[in-house]
């Protein structure tokens, strides 16, 4: 079949026009036509020219009269080439050569009727998402919508979005899989080049080299190379030479402490926590903070003491029970109500009562937990420093139920007026009554009393005066441990009574402050007793006299009012041996006591 072609110049001009139209953005105005019916069946009035926005972007004005002329001269765009000729021939050529591709610019004089678009949409996308049908055949009566679907590479807006999403998802999955595969990169042993099982001793290594290095650093490792210390260590020959294998372990960086911080075992973390707890407790004790939850010393601390005393292993309740059992019995005085009081008679009654109480005090001290673990020198030293304080706190405790009076014995109850018969006794009486009133106001319990009494015994000689002529304590550390134990027992009693932490702190401070007043009263009483001795008002008994002389040796030289003569070494040795002999002589076995307890 032959076709008539146009000139070359006109063909090139039309080609440029078509290329320009294809490159224009698809933002053409919508198809302008009068709406005579609902969408889907739209009729064009033949009397009015109408503007069509064709898919390729070219706008044409036509009416029914000009349709035939336009159809006769419409150019045809084909896939195999560009040809220009009459409309009928061009339509036949275009249909035969393009197949399913749409025919452009073929116009019919008959009215245009748009039908519902098929499910397959146009490959040409409208800017506003409208679906525009495309036309293939030149029919004399009307334009028909081709039912054949568009090519596979053309899709609607929604289909494109779904397809793009699926493509992005699949590409991201492929990238993620590639990253995971690269993360799971196979690692090899730095020693023998076998597959590594993990990070061991600072390097990536297999199980065999890890176990070999562990055995080598923990046990016998004096290996000898049978060759020149240059053996090849690989997967197959790693067991041939232990010396070269160990050498290579060190060369690649294996070390005993080479453990990753995030792979520390439970045992190592447990040891680290124990170390931190011990350091924290030491810092806490150094700063003087009060113990909170755990009142007892740590076993790690007790282990380093000079003596592992059984008293340090007692619980709070066991300590209280032991102190209550050790309490001495009540002692009756030789008071005769038929005889009036005088200075000599009252001092004789009081000194005789004190001398007998000293005997029971020695027996009580030996039963205090921790006191019997001390050597004889320290036991004598503590008793010589605290004997009058112990007698006074016992007197104050017995007098709590008798306001304004002092109960020296069950048959000897004295008030302030009766104490005036002894020179200088009223001041000491007033201090004793004030302390008894303080105990009564605080509602002191018997368990707290025995703890305070033991604290007085153990704390009296710890801080020896620099001017003292006797040597100080030899086992101060052990004494401090026992003191801490008794103090913790006192706190336990307060917590057991239901006191809050703040109330416990306040009550403990108040009780310890009372001990300082008792120390002051003891010093006043010692001065008064020494003055009575110097005036020969009353004879002193042997044990009481020894205690008084020993106290003068422990006290500063200026305390007694008159400067004492410096004792000789013979006097010091005699006093020390006499006191020690007195402690052993006046010791009463517990089974020999037949008197009721004071508590």
From Swiss-Prot:
Annotated NR LBD domain residues: 315-551
Record annotation: effect of changing residue 508 to A: Reduces DNA-binding, attenuates transcriptional activity, does not effect estrogen-dependent NF-kappa B transcriptional repression
Covalently lipidated residues, kind S-palmitoyl cysteine: 451
Outcome reported for the amino acid change (mutating residue 376 to D): Reduces transcriptional activity and estrogen-induced interaction with NCOA1
Cross-referenced InterPro entries: Est_rcpt/est-rel_rcp, Estr_rcpt, Estr_rcpt_N, NHR-like_dom_sf, Nucl_hrmn_rcpt_lig-bd, Nuclear_hormone_rcpt_NR3, Nuclear_hrmn_rcpt, Oestrogen-typ_rcpt_final_C_dom
Effect of residue 591 to Q: In strain: SJL/J
Residues modified to Phosphoserine: 108, 110, 122, 171
Location of region: Disordered: 147-175, 557-581
UniProt cross-references to PROSITE patterns, sorted A to Z: NR_LBD (PS51843), NUCLEAR_REC_DBD_1 (PS00031), NUCLEAR_REC_DBD_2 (PS51030)
Known glycosylation sites: 10, 50, 575
Stretches for region Interaction with DDX5: 35-178
Region named Self-association: 268-599
Effect annotated for changing residue 380 to D: Abolishes transcriptional activity and estrogen-induced interaction with NCOA1
Asymmetric dimethylarginine, modified sites: 264
One GO process term, biological-process aspect: positive regulation of nitric oxide biosynthetic process
Compositionally biased tracts (Low complexity): 568-581
SMART domains assigned to the protein according to its UniProt record, in alphabetical order: HOLI (SM00430), ZnF_C4 (SM00399)
Region described as Transactivation AF-2: 315-599
Main location, first listed in the record: nucleus
Name of the protein in its database record: Estrogen receptor
Protein source organism: Mus musculus (Mouse)
């Amino acid at each position: 079949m032959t076709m008539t072609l146009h000139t070359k110049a006109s063909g090139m001009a039309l080609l440029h026009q078509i290329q320009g139209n294809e490159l224009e953005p698809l933002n053409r105005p919508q198809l302008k036509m009068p709406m005579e019916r609902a969408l889907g069946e739209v009729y064009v009035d033949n009397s009015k020219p109408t503007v069509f926005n064709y898919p390729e972007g070219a706008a044409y004005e036509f009416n029914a009269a000009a349709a035939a002329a336009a159809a006769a001269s419409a150019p045809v765009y084909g896939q195999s080439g560009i040809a220009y000729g009459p409309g009928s021939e061009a339509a036949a050529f275009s249909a035969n050569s393009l197949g399913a591709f749409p025919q452009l610019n073929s116009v019919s004089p008959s009215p245009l009727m748009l039908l519902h678009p098929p499910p397959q949409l146009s490959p040409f996308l409208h800017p506003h998402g409208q679906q525009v049908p495309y036309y293939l055949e030149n029919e004399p009566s009307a334009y028909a919508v081709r039912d054949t679907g568009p090519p596979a590479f053309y899709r609607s807006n929604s289909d494109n979005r779904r397809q793009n999403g699926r493509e992005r998802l699949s590409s991201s999955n492929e990238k993620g899989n590639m990253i995971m595969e690269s993360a799971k990169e196979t690692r090899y042993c730095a020693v023998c080049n076998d597959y590594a099982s993990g990070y061991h001793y600072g390097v990536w290594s297999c199980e065999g080299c890890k176990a070999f290095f562990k055995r080598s650093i923990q046990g016998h490792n004096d290996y000898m190379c049978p060759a020149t210390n240059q053996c090849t260590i690989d997967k197959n020959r790693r067991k041939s030479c232990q010396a070269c294998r160990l050498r290579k372990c060190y060369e690649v960086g294996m070390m005993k402490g080479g453990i990753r911080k995030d792979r520390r075992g439970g045992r190592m973390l447990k040891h680290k926590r124990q170390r931190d707890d011990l350091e924290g407790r030491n810092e806490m004790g150094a700063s003087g903070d009060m113990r909170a939850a755990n009142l007892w010393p740590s076993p790690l601390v007790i282990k380093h003491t000079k003596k592992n005393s059984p008293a340090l292993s007692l619980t709070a309740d066991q300590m209280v029970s032991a102190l209550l059992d050790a309490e001495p019995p009540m002692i009756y005085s030789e008071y005769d109500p038929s005889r009036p009081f005088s200075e000599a008679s009252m001092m004789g009654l009081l000194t005789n009562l004190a001398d007998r109480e000293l005997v029971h005090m020695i027996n009580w001290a030996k039963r205090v937990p921790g006191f019997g673990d001390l050597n004889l020198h320290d036991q004598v030293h503590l008793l010589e420093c605290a004997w009058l304080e112990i007698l006074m706190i016992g007197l104050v405790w017995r007098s709590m139920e008798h306001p304004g009076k002092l109960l020296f014995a069950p048959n000897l109850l004295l008030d302030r007026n009766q104490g005036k018969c002894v020179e200088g006794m009223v001041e000491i009486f007033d201090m004793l009554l004030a302390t008894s009133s303080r105990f009564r106001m605080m509602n002191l319990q018997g368990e707290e009393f025995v703890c305070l009494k033991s604290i007085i015994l153990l704390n009296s000689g710890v801080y020896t005066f620099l001017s003292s002529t006797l040597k100080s304590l030899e086992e101060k550390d052990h004494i401090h441990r026992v003191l801490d134990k008794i103090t913790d027992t006192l706190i336990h009693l307060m917590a057991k009574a239901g006191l809050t932490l703040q109330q416990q702190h306040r009550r403990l401070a108040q009780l310890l402050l009372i001990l300082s007043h008792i120390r002051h009263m003891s010093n006043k009483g010692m001065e008064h007793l020494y003055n009575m001795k110097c005036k020969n008002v009353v004879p002193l008994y042997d044990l009481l006299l020894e205690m008084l002389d020993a106290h003068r040796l422990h006290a500063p030289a200026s305390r007694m009012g008159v400067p004492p003569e410096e004792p000789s070494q013979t006097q010091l040795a005699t006093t020390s041996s006499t006191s020690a002999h007195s402690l052993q002589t006046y010791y009463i076995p517990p089974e020999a006591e037949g008197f009721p307890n004071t508590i």
